[in-house]
Amino acid sequence: MELPGDGVHLASYGPRAPQLAVNGKAPAGGLDGSGYYQCYRDGSSVASRGSDAPTGYDTVDAPPHYDFYANTEVWGRRRRVRPSLYQLSVDPEQDDFKPPMYEETAGERMGGGDSSEEEEEEHKEPPPEPPRFGWVQGVMIRCMLNIWGVILYLRLPWITAQAGIGLTWVIILLSSFITGITGLSTSAIATNGKVKGGGTYFLISRSLGPELGGSIGLIFAFANAVAVAMHTVGFAETVTDLMRENGVVMVDPINDIRIVGVITVTCLLGISMAGMEWESKAQVLFFLVIMVSFVNYIVGTIIPASPQKQAKGFFSYKAEIFAANFVPGWRGKEGSFFGMFSIFFPSATGILAGANISGDLKDPTVAIPRGTLMAIFWTTISYLIISATIGACVVRDASGELNDTLSYSSSSENCSGLACQYRWDFSECIKNNTCKHGIMNYYQSMSLVSAFAPLISAGIFGATLSSALACLVSAPKVFQCLCKDQLYPLIGFFGKGYGKNAEPLRAYLLTYVIAVCFVLIAELNTIAPIISNFFLCSYALINFSCFHASVTNSPGWRPSFRFYSKWLSLLGAVCCVVIMFLLTWWAALIAFGVVFFLLGYTLYKKPAVNWGSSVQASSYSMALNQCVGLNQVEDHVKNYRPQCLVLTGPPCCRPALVDLVGCLTKRLSLMMCGHVVTAGPSPVSERHVTWLNQRKVRSFYRGVVAADLRSGVNMLLQGAGLGRIKPNVLLMGFKKDWGCDSPQAAHHYIGILHDAFDLHYGVCVLRVKEGLDASHPPQCHVNPGFDGGPESINTVCAPACVQTSVTSSVSMDPDPQPSSVFQKKQGKKTIDIYWLSDDGGLTLLLPYLLTRRKRWAGCKVRVFVGGDTDKKEEQKEEVLALIKKFRLGFHDVEVLPDIHQPPQPGNVDHFEDSVNRFRLETNPKQDSDSGPQQQQQEEPWMITEQDLERNRAKSLRQIRLNEVLQVHSREAALIVITMPVGRRGVCPSTLFLAWLDVLSRDLRPPVLLVRGNQENVLTFYCQ
């Protein structure tokens, strides 16, 4: 057995492959008579019996196998699955518990299924194999036929007359240089992995990504559809010329071309819709006809010219004719080098005809390079030979009249032109510009030169029809792949396939309509330049794709075709762009305009595809280089940015915290959502990233496994980030349930704050009256001890949401998006800043960053500071002057002289009641060894009378501040206040937490407690 298109032989495989253990439970296994590697229920295997495994020991470990890397399955057998690390490292009979951060692999998710259904599928007949082509029939012949188009027979002699043999060779070689480089780049891209259907679009999109790939795919499909019209018009021109020679005219020359063209395109549509097998047979027939016409032409150049042919300008090989035709003879509005190049270049654009049917090739990675390069070589040789031979045999101008001969007795003094040397006088038609023959005037010059003219007509028919047919097949194939990727709206309808080969019949009809529209132009010299820029644009992108993939140094760029150069590819891309503007600058602008429009649309929509493109590799490379470069830059206060580590747990459980920090850091600095797992399974990390992306929050997600919350957060504080791009501010939710939760949880919570201070972090604590937990959160596990609510530290976010395994039937749709107070526009409210202690300026900087966002732009910022009644105005002016130097734009400053007054007794009693649970009572009968100090060492969260007395002033200050907040900021949108700091060893953790609680209690607006790391984050200096 052989897998289609990959060349991997599976002769040693049996009809049925085993299934490895899934979720620790292995299916029944053993040797099924085929001698294969099997897994058993006990997790063991028989790799040593009848297996290809390079070991003699029983093991679940599997030897290297093709199935482990393939994305597709072979009909008639189940695909093998590589064992996971969990299956290798855990005995499922002894230990069914998965590690907390365990995530099932794709292979394990595939492992389930009904065995009866699988056996039934195995007995079904395999689907019929569609026809596949090798490199000769599938690529080389197809490319040669597409290159040998209408230009070869009908315009190459005319181009030779205009540009001369010398410049015609330059045009041919320049075109071949561009197509040759593009062929090398195409070969490199096509051999960098298994190629599927879609041709040029597939190659570019999988290399550069959907943004550029989609735009070029659409343009290339359109260019091929227009090329159908170009080749069809060439065929119709020949038919109408033959009709006129025989006195047959339907309407007039232009309308005759239109009628014949539409009929021809309709017939070609029928052949193409019959299937690739019939189309390929037709191409082989056309190829044989063209080869016969070439032989007929070469023989004709050798045969001596008859008087009838001499009258039309053919004199066989003459050195004088070669010399005269070697130099240019520009005529008409198209008479220029780039005018001729624009007309000739479409004849060289057929090099991608083979790549465009990559899905119909036996082995695209072999067929595309070999067939494409051979086609370029042989067609270039044929173009050079024909231009040289036609230029050496036929003069530029001839009348076609037998009466224009010169008798041997007559004088040739009044005769002008090269034909005078051969006793022919075409002077009159040359002077009057009425010559109808010669390579400058007669498009059918190759028929004139040939030994048998009808064979050249047959060659023209074969070349034009084969090229038109190839383009008629290429355009729908490319467009079908583009439709299946769903990058653009309203085009999916055309991607549906029919039959065993999934023929895109709807796309065929669309191509037919486009071709007919351009056939109605009925002017070959008008159609050819239109598509030149589109093909050049495609070639530029192919060359740039190869260069970009090479220059990023991605380990995934490993083309088996080695004969390419990244710098040569870059040169090819630049040449294509330059030539686009030299040919038709306005058409080049239109082409680039269309590309950039489609590029912008794709960037805006952000299609959910991941193809491992070189753009992704380049993004990584650039980010890595920038990160390394930042290590050489010293920190400066002017460049300070709050880079936030947000203890959200699963981000979907605390949307308010995510929204507030996301608003602070969006397009400004780093945001990282931290998640500590202490018990139970963790949700898949990709799910959280998807949720963040759908909420349009620019944040990273980082989950760690730890024995407890504090050690996990410590891991995040020390290990999060990269180089200088690492968090410097810790944000977390307030622990509302500290009074009813275990005292150890409160101690760990405050310990996290101290750990952050020790690591030089700024710290922010957010308290929202409604709590930070979403009302109906999706599946998630809460980090113990973060957030308010009567729940215990090990509860889940909501009883209706329990995390399940990925292998269950639960839908993997993205989590719902709960709303939060920070998602709404805040209107004309106020942001109240209580700048009571100087922490370096972080308390001022965060509200300033908020006011730069649209949601908060309408809010007025008020700054409250402490002061004395008798110096109130002086202190206000001092603070205003300082804030003005910071250039923050805050103009409303209020001095609060009453914050030093004693609080109300009722509030003091309420505070004491909140800490009574944690107080140590002094017993006079206790031994000194077991006194409060000894008990506090064992339980450091407990509060002694000495602690209360020592910290009484600070406690009363927090109670009084809450009363001030109730008076001044009841209607604010947000309150930002400097966080008090309790000294370790002096202020017990529960007392510190009680301060934070009483300071922010019973406030309707959200409260953000902020404490910087006591270093400047604001400066009024310019250096």
Swiss-Prot record:
It catalyses: chloride(out) + Na(+)(out) = chloride(in) + Na(+)(in). Residues 91-131 are annotated as: Disordered. The chain crosses the membrane at residues 135-164, 165-186, 218-240, 253-277, 278-300, 336-357, 369-390, 453-476, 507-521, 527-543, 567-586, 587-598. It is a multi-pass membrane protein. Residues 241-252, 301-335, 391-452, 522-526 are extracellular. ATP binds at L647, R654, V676, G733, L772. Disulfide bonds join C415-C420, C429-C435. Inhibited by thiazide-type diuretics including polythiazide, metolazone, cyclothiazide, hydrochlorothiazide and chlorthalidone. Thiazide drugs, specifically inhibit SLC12A3/NCC transporter activity by competing with chloride for binding. It comes from the Eukaryota. InterPro entries: AA-permease/SLC12A_dom (IPR004841), AA_permease_N (IPR013612), SLC12_C (IPR018491), SLC12A3 (IPR002948), SLC12A_fam (IPR004842). GO terms for biological process: cell volume homeostasis; chloride ion homeostasis; potassium ion homeostasis; potassium ion import across plasma membrane; sodium ion homeostasis. Residues 614-629 are annotated as: Scissor helix. Homodimer; adopts a domain-swap conformation at the scissor helices connecting the transmembrane domain and C-terminal domain. One of its GO terms (molecular function) is ATP binding. It is found in: Cell membrane. This is Solute carrier family 12 member 3. Belongs to the SLC12A transporter family. It comes from Pseudopleuronectes americanus. Residues 1-134, 187-217, 358-368, 477-506, 544-566, 599-1023 are cytoplasmic. Expressed in urinary bladder, intestine, ovary, skeletal muscle, eye, brain, and kidney. Pfam families: AA_permease, AA_permease_N, SLC12. Glycans are attached at N403, N414, N432. Keywords: ATP-binding, Cell membrane, Chloride, Disulfide bond, Glycoprotein, Ion transport, Membrane, Metal-binding, Nucleotide-binding, Sodium, Sodium transport, Symport, Transmembrane, Transmembrane helix, Transport. One of its GO terms (cellular component) is apical plasma membrane.
